[in-house]
Amino acid sequence: MAENIVVFEIPYACPQSQPDHDLMLALATVFNREQEHLGTAALSEATPEEFSACLNPSPDSVVKHRIFVALKASALAEDASGVDPTTGAASKAPKLGVADDASRDRSTASNASANSNTAPVLPHEVRVRDVVGYASLMYWDQPEAKQGYLSVFTDVDYRRQGIGSALHEAAANRARTLGLSIVEGWVVAISDRITPPQREAAVHLPNGDSFPMVPELAATMSWGYELGNVEYMNALHFPMTEDAIAILTARAAEMPSNFQVYSWLDADYPPELADPAKFMESFLRLRSYANEEIPAGELSVENHSHTLASWEALVERDVRAGKQLLNAAICDESGQVVALSTAQRQARPEGVFHQDTTLVAPSARGQKLGWALKAALHKLIVSTCDQPRAILTWNAVSNKSMLHINESIGFHPFLLEGVVQLRL
């Protein structure tokens, strides 16, 4: 890595001071420049509030983030003694490289070694142009959780300098100290290469799927990752056509009458529920199996569970980030949730939604419940958003049935993504 770049970990639960806001803005800028490079800026944009919310979860949250930043060494306004060389004043800036939440998660053992008097310190003012990359590690703070999710972003003007490798090394080392054994990441093929390759240089999976050997995939493989799955990022632009709405409405109407559909925003549960806590217990129980039910190719899969408190903490975090969660669920005659779907209205760009989970229990499949979920979410979107622009969803290339359903109502592939995993 270039000698003029410093990589360190942002303090967990960092104070909400102005320098921290500027740093969050810088991280969002790196992400957004990457979206411009990929041609996805109209559909995906980060905000400073999103990063701040991730670093400051509520006590009940089990979803945690660690963020590592690559900063120009010239931006360090203070020397190792903690004195500003330009003013001679003692530093009041928080030290970086210190995970200072030993009482809040399982990283206690690693905090002592990270806490050093010689750790670099955050400048009083972080300029956007001084941040040249970051890595984000998301994980579940539960003893049984062994899998994390790691993303690395290097500013488009600072590639091929080893910055991404240094960021990845720092984040992977943190994952090890947290007791994780696998990290998962994503690489993207830009929109003009969306068709999975057949004969060109590519990595091929046993199921026949393949992903082009783009530089990002080559880099992750050099770090030890293996390609495990290939997905389409699909986009549906609003308004839906009359034909698409007719198809959606007709298919949803075929759901048997003994099922009941519910929909709600954030944690404002449907008022017609007699026992919201019992309903959500059933909802979260089904959701905990989502990962193993989704076509995963060669990936190692880990399910994650929520209590009602931890789920509401996750919703509250996203609300602080300016987002909104749209929920749809279907109950059978016994009151058990047998199908669910969630989508998230993004803070930016306005009117863009990300659909992250759709699941129908095996016992209830083949009865058009999936169509009913899509119809319920569509109704929520158009009734709560004045100008909806698009909804995005991610589907494995091998999931032909879901891709066909989505295509029939107007979704089209926008990006090709390779899902990779590293065993630590």
Where are these regions (language model features)?
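Conserved hydrophobic beta-strand within the GNAT/NAT acetyltransferase core sheet
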Residues: 150, 183-187, 355, 391-393
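Conserved acetyl-CoA-binding loop-helix of GNAT-fold acetyltransferases
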Residues: 160-176, 360, 366-379
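A conserved beta-strand-loop-helix scaffold within acyl/acetyltransferase catalytic domains
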Residues: 38-64, 72-74, 134-144, 291-352, ...
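General structural concept
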Residues: 132-139, 147-151, 166
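A short, internal acetyl-CoA/4′-phosphopantetheine-binding micro-motif in the GNAT/acyltransferase core
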Residues: 151-159, 189, 357-366
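Acyl-donor-binding surface of acyltransferase catalytic domains
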Residues: 1-13, 168-275, 417-421
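Short amphipathic alpha-helix that is part of the acyltransferase structural core
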Residues: 1-88, 92-106, 113, 117-130, ...
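Short hairpin/turn module used for nucleic-acid contact or packing/dimerization
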Residues: 362-424
